[in-house]
Regions:
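Cytosolic nucleotide-utilizing catalytic cores of signal-transduction proteins
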Residues: 1-108
Length: 108
């Protein structure tokens, strides 16, 4: 069960899973079309970057890779999705999309 104080985006995704899944496929479509290893690497990087407060350095420590590797992967997500991680709306859309994908996978 998702609680609001855990993460508001997770609550939104859990409250309307079909819509959240549709948004996730719209936002992350090109990423989801990649092979499993690359897709998971990029989704893990975005998710970890969020958990690290948007810090490539902190995300790199959590992922056991160089911060430039994190930045490279994030640029790849930006290129594939057409969304800039410096634009607040795009960040919110990507955050919701990643959480929706994770919830969808957990339910399977």
């Amino acid at each position: 069960m998702a609680r609001f104080d855990d993460n508001p985006l997770t609550v939104v995704a859990a409250a309307a899973p079909e819509e959240a899944g549709r948004v996730a496929r719209l936002v992350l479509g090109p990423v989801l079309a990649l092979g499993a290893a690359e897709r998971d690497r990029l989704l893990d990087t975005v998710e970890t970057w969020f958990a690290a407060g948007g810090s490539a350095e902190a995300a790199g420590r959590l992922l056991y890779c160089h911060p430039n590797t994190v930045r490279y992967r994030l640029r790849k997500v930006e290129a594939l999705t057409g969304r800039s991680l410096s634009a607040p709306q795009a960040v919110a859309e990507l955050g919701l999309a990643v959480r929706a994908i994770r919830l969808e996978a957990a339910e399977k």
